């Protein structure tokens, strides 16, 4: 028995340890339940959160605005973000960075870098020698990469979300333009790592908008496909998307709505910013013409003046969208000269005429990629701020040939709301209604490799092969497996972009390198030597295009296969019996699914890639498999593979083959006798086929990134440290400013209080002069030396002043509280005295209070009266400038003591059962004897806390009183002090009404 107890103790300890760990995990999880989304626009960003009790809410920034400028101002000793940075664009345009997202993932020779220099010549860009990218040179000692600047913005967005949610947030979904390539997407992910954010997904902004549109219209989506076009023209870019909505059947949740991206078209430079730049140039020209002959400098050479003109151009674009003309005016544009000029909408449209001609371009691209016509589009919906320009709507309406353009979506916040819905769906802390999202690959990706072939006996040559890995407009996320055959030594292959003919020449130059990665495999020959008795099934490379649209090579492995015959003698009687029974129901043997060793893998069921075709001569050299195909029951099944290039493990549909595959038919025929009778055990031993066993060997992989090298880990760590130091510096600055403001406010408030009568009444002239002198000295110090003072010094100065004024403030505060506290004490004393008098007037036969209880209450009342009178008399003798003896906390303590005694008696009166009156033979009530005391009557008293209730016998009540008085079988609801009791009739009525509600 002792041994058993000893064995149970470790188990109990382990159980309690697991419970403690689980509780700790739950508590940690509850602190970080909120998730966020960031809609990164070219000019501004929108942040949304989801937390328990707050479903899908846009975050308000510190200025209570729903969108925040994507602007950063960097100086030597300070940094500004958001609206404060946008305000610094006029004062310090060189240090204020905007529209830097256009530089992400681009090298110095990219046309977009030259365009950025032309648009914002005030910024100095230098070249990173390692990656050949650009960096902002703020000062000789201060430079930042575009990823670092974006990391600052993302960190700022998280701080806004955390302040709004009132809890820490780490998980986020970030929107990116649909046309971002691999280098640009990796740059955003690196920026998020610098900010300390865990990116659940990089979602395309057009997909997020489509998701937001579908989520709020779930009821309108049915099995009939609905094609909707979203035209999104923002500040910097334009994207047109064709989306198909319909319900599909899923394995997990049955019929659910789905959105599928069918076509995408875009223009990287068409947007509101280009219109503003045209207007800025027009205003600069007008200003120069007004100053002609004054020997003035060109306004274009003044960065501050150009920043003012750009801000005015932005305002003009907005106003001219609703008015035919407007007066542009800027005070002190340059050299204290004011600028004023009238601009009409017609002039603005003439300046941007070539831009409006490009509006239909993305529409045609989207239709071509979707292989659809405008007749199949049911609705065209406007998204983005630049679509509010009337000319854009006019040209677009003519291009799509519709009666009207849809404006039934929040053009500014739709992407943020869709992204935060996806964040909640990806988070484990929330459960949302399923909405299937099938995004599309914009740029096809293929695998290229070369191998030696023998065209003629003795003549060998190299043959270049290509295979599409992810086709254009194919769905993602999904994984692919490429199998390389006939390789007996180490080899290389390349991952590149596919056919980009749909891009124009300018877009191809902006796109950058079309070569992604070179993969070098090591250990192929050694793996073949390791398994000489196995048949090689080739080298399998596993690729994954994840939810963020980022391509990765998960692993490369060498696969071998052999036939293994199971010995019938090894099977037990139970195994034979189980196999026989399972064969009666058409099931296979369990031995076919066994794994042999740790390296054996199960057969995968794979399907061919959409749109991939084998070139002549490639069959047998390379096979392609779909590792994790995206489920879509609405799409037709892929065609049956032919030849050696068919995906391994592919099995025809059971319905097409009569419910049996070719590999299963001989086995099933051998297992079943006439009329389905199972064969004898001897026959089963002979007819049982050998099973296949797979062995895999990991192959070494060396990757060489060709499009844009990622930041090395040490460089990334330095960037993270740099951003953390800036954040700490900002926090210290905020803390110092808060301390300085508190000190300054205390000085001003106290100086004013010294002249108020209530403060002069409780202080002497000497005391006021001492305080006033200290305040003046601190104020002088703050003006002279406060700019260089640390946070600790400011807090110490404030603490000294508060200590000096503590007595004065205490006396004033006490005198303010006296009237209210004394009035409350008097009321309580009066009510307590009245209650005591009433209690003593209760007839002796009905008395529920003991003499000790009433005497105790009387003593407390008398003591309180005596304390009050004595303290007031003593306080009247003291001068107002001395510390008072009548303290508000003492008054509150006396009130609490008196109230406690009264509440005890009140509770006793509430819950005491009245003594039932017995009846005589004639049916009349018998009065208790005159000499009956209160202690002889039955009562129920609420016992003090921590003491058990004493059980007392209770006489059975009369039948006539059972409806109004509770019986012993009915539990009484006991309330605490101050609780109100309700009549039993009302409780019964409530019970009856609740029963009626249930019916």
From Swiss-Prot:
InterPro entries membership: ATPase_NBD (IPR043129), Heat_shock_70_CS (IPR018181), HSP70_C_sf (IPR029048), HSP70_peptide-bd_sf (IPR029047), Hsp_70_fam (IPR013126)
Subcellular location: Endoplasmic reticulum lumen
Region named Disordered: 564-694, 909-999
Pfam families assigned to the protein according to its UniProt record, in alphabetical order: HSP70
Cleavable signal peptide: 1-32
BP GO annotations: endoplasmic reticulum unfolded protein response; negative regulation of hypoxia-induced intrinsic apoptotic signaling pathway
UniProt subunit comment: Part of a large chaperone multiprotein complex comprising DNAJB11, HSP90B1, HSPA5, HYOU, PDIA2, PDIA4, PDIA6, PPIB, SDF2L1, UGGT1 and very small amounts of ERP29, but not, or at very low levels, CALR nor CANX.
Family the UniProt entry places it in: Belongs to the heat shock protein 70 family.
Protein name: Hypoxia up-regulated protein 1
Organism: Cricetulus griseus (Chinese hamster)
Gene (name only): HYOU1
């Amino acid at each position: 028995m002792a041994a058993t107890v000893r064995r149970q103790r470790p188990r109990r300890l382990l159980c309690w340890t697991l419970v403690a760990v689980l509780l700790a995990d739950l508590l940690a999880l509850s602190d970080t339940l909120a998730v966020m989304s960031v809609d990164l626009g070219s000019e501004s960003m929108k942040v949304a959160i989801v937390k328990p009790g707050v479903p899908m809410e846009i975050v308000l920034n510190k200025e209570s605005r729903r969108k925040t400028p994507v602007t950063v101002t960097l100086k030597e000793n300070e940094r500004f973000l958001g609206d404060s940075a946008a305000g610094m664009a006029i004062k310090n345009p060189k240090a204020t960075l905007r529209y830097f997202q256009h530089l992400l993932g681009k090298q110095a020779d990219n046309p977009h870098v030259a365009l950025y220099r032309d648009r914002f010549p005030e910024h100095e860009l230098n070249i990173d020698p390692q990656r050949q990218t650009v960096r902002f040179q703020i000062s000789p000692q201060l430079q930042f990469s575009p990823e670092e600047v974006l990391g600052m913005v993302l960190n700022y967005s998280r701080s806004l979300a955390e302040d709004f949610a009132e809890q820490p947030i780490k998980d986020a979904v970030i929107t990116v333009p649909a046309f971002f390539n691999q280098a640009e997407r990796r740059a955003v992910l690196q920026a998020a790592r610098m900010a300390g954010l865990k990116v659940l997904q990089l979602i395309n902004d057009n997909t997020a908008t489509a998701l937001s549109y579908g989520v709020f219209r779930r009821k309108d989506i049915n099995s009939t496909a609905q094609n909707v076009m979203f035209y999104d023209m923002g500040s910097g870019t334009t994207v047109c998307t064709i989306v198909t909505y319909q319900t599909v059947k899923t394995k997990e949740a049955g019929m659910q709505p789905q959105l599928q991206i069918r076509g995408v078209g875009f223009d990287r430079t068409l947007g509101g910013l280009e219109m503003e730049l045209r207007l800025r140039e027009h205003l600069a020209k007008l200003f120069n013409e007004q100053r002609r002959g004054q020997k003035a400098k060109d306004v274009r050479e003044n960065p501050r003046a150009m920043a003012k003109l750009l801000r005015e151009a932005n305002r003009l674009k907005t106003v001219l969208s609703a008015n035919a003309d407007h007066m542009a005016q800027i005070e002190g544009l340059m050299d204290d000269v004011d600028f004023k000029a009238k601009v009409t909408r017609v002039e603005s449209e003439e300046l941007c005429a070539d831009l409006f001609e490009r509006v239909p371009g993305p529409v045609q691209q989207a239709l071509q990629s979707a292989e659809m016509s405008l007749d199949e589009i049911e609705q065209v919906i406007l998204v983005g701020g630049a679509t509010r320009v009337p000319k854009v709507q006019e040209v677009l309406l003519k291009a799509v040939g519709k009666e009207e353009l849809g404006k039934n979506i929040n053009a500014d916040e739709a992407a943020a709301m869709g992204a935060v819905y996806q964040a909640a769906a990806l988070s484990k802390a929330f459960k949302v209604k399923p909405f299937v999202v099938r995004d599309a690959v914009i740029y096809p990706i293929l695998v290229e490799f070369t191998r030696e072939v023998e065209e003629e006996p003795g003549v060998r040559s190299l043959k270049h092969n290509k295979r599409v890995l992810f086709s254009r407009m194919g769905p993602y996320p999904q994984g692919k497996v490429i199998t390389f055959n006939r390789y007996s030594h180490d080899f290389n292959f390349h991952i590149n972009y596919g056919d980009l003919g749909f891009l124009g020449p300018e877009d191809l130059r902006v796109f950058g390198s079309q070569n992604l990665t070179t993969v070098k495999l090591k250990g192929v020959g050694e793996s073949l030597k390791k398994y000489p008795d196995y048949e090689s099934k080739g080298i399998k490379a596993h690729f994954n295009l994840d939810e963020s649209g980022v391509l990765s090579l998960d692993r490369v492995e060498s696969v071998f296969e052999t036939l293994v015959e199971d010995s019938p003698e090894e099977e037990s009687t139970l195994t034979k019996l189980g196999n026989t029974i399972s064969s009666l129901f058409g099931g296979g043997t369990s031995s076919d699914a066994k794994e042999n060793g740790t390296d054996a893998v199960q057969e995968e069921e794979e399907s061919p890639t959409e749109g991939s075709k084998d070139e002549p001569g490639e069959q047998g050299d390379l096979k392609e498999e779909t590792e994790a195909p995206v489920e879509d029951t609405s799409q037709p099944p892929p065609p049956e593979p032919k030849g050696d290039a068919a995906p391994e493990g592919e099995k025809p549909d059971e319905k097409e083959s009569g419910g049996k595959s070719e590999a299963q038919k001989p086995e099933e025929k051998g297992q079943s006798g006439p009329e389905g009778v199972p064969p004898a055990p001897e026959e089963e031993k002979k007819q049982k086929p050998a099973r296949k066993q797979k062995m895999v060997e990991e192959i070494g992989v060396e990757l060489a990134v060709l499009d844009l090298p990622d930041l090395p880990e040490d460089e990334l760590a330095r960037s993270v440290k740099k951003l953390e130091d800036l954040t700490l510096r900002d926090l210290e600055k905020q803390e110092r400013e808060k301390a300085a403001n508190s000190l300054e406010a205390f000085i001003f408030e106290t100086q004013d209080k010294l002249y108020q009568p209530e403060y002069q009444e409780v202080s002497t002239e000497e005391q006021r002069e001492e305080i006033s002198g200290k305040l003046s000295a601190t104020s002088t110090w703050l003006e002279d030396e406060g700019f260089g003072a640390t946070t600790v010094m400011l807090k110490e100065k404030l603490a000294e002043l508060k200590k000096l004024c503590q007595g004065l403030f205490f006396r004033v505060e006490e005198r303010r509280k006296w009237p209210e506290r004394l009035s409350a004490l008097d009321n309580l004393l009066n009510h307590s005295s009245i209650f005591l008098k009433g209690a003593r007037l209760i007839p002796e036969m009905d008395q529920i209070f003991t003499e000790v209880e009433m005497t105790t209450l009387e003593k407390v009342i008398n003591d309180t009266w005596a304390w009050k009178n004595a303290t007031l008399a003593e306080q009247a003798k003291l001068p107002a400038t001395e510390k008072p003896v009548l303290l508000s906390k003492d008054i509150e303590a006396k009130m609490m003591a008196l109230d406690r005694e009264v509440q005890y008696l009140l509770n006793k009166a509430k819950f005491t059962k009245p003594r039932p009156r017995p009846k005589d033979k004639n049916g009349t009530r018998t009065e208790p004897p005159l000499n009956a005391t209160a202690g002889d009557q039955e009562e129920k008293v609420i016992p003090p806390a921590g003491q058990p209730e004493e059980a007392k016998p209770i006489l059975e009540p009369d039948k006539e009183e059972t409806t109004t008085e509770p019986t012993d079988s009915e539990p009484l609801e006991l309330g605490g002090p101050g609780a109100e009791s309700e009549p039993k009739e009302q409780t019964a009525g409530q019970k009856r009404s609740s029963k009626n509600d249930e019916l």
